[in-house]
Amino acid sequence: MALSVIQACRSLALSTWLLSFCFVHLLCLDFTVAEKEEWYTAFVNITYVDPDTAEVRTEKTECGRYGEHSLKREARGVLAMPAAPHDRHACDPSGRFTPRAHGAWIALISRGNCTYKDKIRHAVGHNASAVVIFNVGSSNPNETITMPHQGISDVVAIMIPEPKGRELVLLMERNITVHMHITIGTRNLQKYVSRTSVVFVSISFIILMIISLAWLVFYYIQRFRYANARDRNQRRLGDAAKKAISQLQVRTIRKGDQETESDFDNCAVCIEGYKPNDVVRILPCRHLFHKCCVDPWLVDHRTCPMCKMNILKALGLTSSAECLNELPLDYELAVGGVALNAMVMSDDVMAGDVGGARDPGVRMGGLPQVLLDSEPLSQDTMPTEQSELQPIASGSSDVSLTTGAGHSDIDTPTDDPKC
């Protein structure tokens, strides 16, 4: 159950990240499709005769901007502005434009006092072929905007900056004939992010972070429980090892024992030979070691240093906790939460084992089958009788046997013994 929950959480977190990334990407693409403004610049080419030098002057700049509903095409003609000095805004439908040309002409109008639609309609009513409105009152003198004039889409209408418009007005007030040629400039696409989309993306991101945070909290809680259960298991195993050690045999080496001979094996822990009056511990596998050397080893490892026999299994104290202790350190990473639940379930079983029970049929529920293959040694095979130790000890030596470290009957050594 824990394994499936962990895998589901991991899959959910990964899927949430991927879906959120794809969603944000598609949402950004939606911005470019739905939230955008397309507008065109206009090249403005003016030609006039300088009255002082009689030279023809031509200026061409990309300073214009087509209106939102304007025809996107070129236009040419003579500039004309409202005749009344007080009505340069062309808000009066009856206002005239001067000078009037016989051919095509373009109206030059100042921004303000009425809508762009009204200005353009009044100029078109006087047969203007195009309308040029120059910006007035903007914080940026060179700013132009895309004029909205819905309903009038059959005429060319552009906006130019205020300085350029003032320049043209001054030329016309000096009675200079100005010819203008308007051509299409650069196409521009301006993208906007809608407020609704920003809120939606923000909410999606918050939900994503909450899911990820919840998964992280769950994951680290599982790891914390696993670490605590493993620590408790180690402490219980240590207590069980101490109880098992108290049931192992202890003897004192005497002069003439075969352990003191030069060809006898040394202690595998300290790599030193046995001397008279040394106290040794005899394990169920019949290997013996210095008591002070092997006891700390058994508390930590619970196995024979030579043959790796498990003393808890040999004495019938094996449990599911011991089997879990033999798992590799990365077992939790390999199987998710199975090890955690198994160790938690094993606490009650271990408590009964440490209390002194030697039930070889102890239940091993929740553990992998591979850990249940090795059965503990039978109590009948344990070397607890002195007669079984005769092949080890010398026939002429005085041997003291004990069955518990707390009930030792060891003679007081006269030499400097080991341990």
From Swiss-Prot:
The keyword Zinc-finger applies. CDD domains: PA_GRAIL_like, RING-H2_RNF150. A zinc finger (RING-type) spans 267-308. GO terms for cellular component: cytoplasm; membrane. The chain crosses the membrane at residues 198-218. Keywords: Membrane, Metal-binding, Signal, Transmembrane, Transmembrane helix, Zinc, Zinc-finger. The keyword Transmembrane helix applies. It is a single-pass type I membrane protein. Residues 376-405 have a biased composition (Polar residues). Residues 374-419 are annotated as: Disordered. Residues 70-172 form the PA domain. GO terms for molecular function: ubiquitin protein ligase activity; zinc ion binding. It is found in: Membrane. InterPro entries: PA_dom_sf, PA_domain, Znf_RING, Znf_RING/FYVE/PHD. Residues 219-419 are cytoplasmic. Residues 35-197 are extracellular. One of its GO terms (biological process) is ubiquitin-dependent protein catabolic process. Residues 1-34 form the signal peptide. This is RING finger protein 150. It comes from Danio rerio.
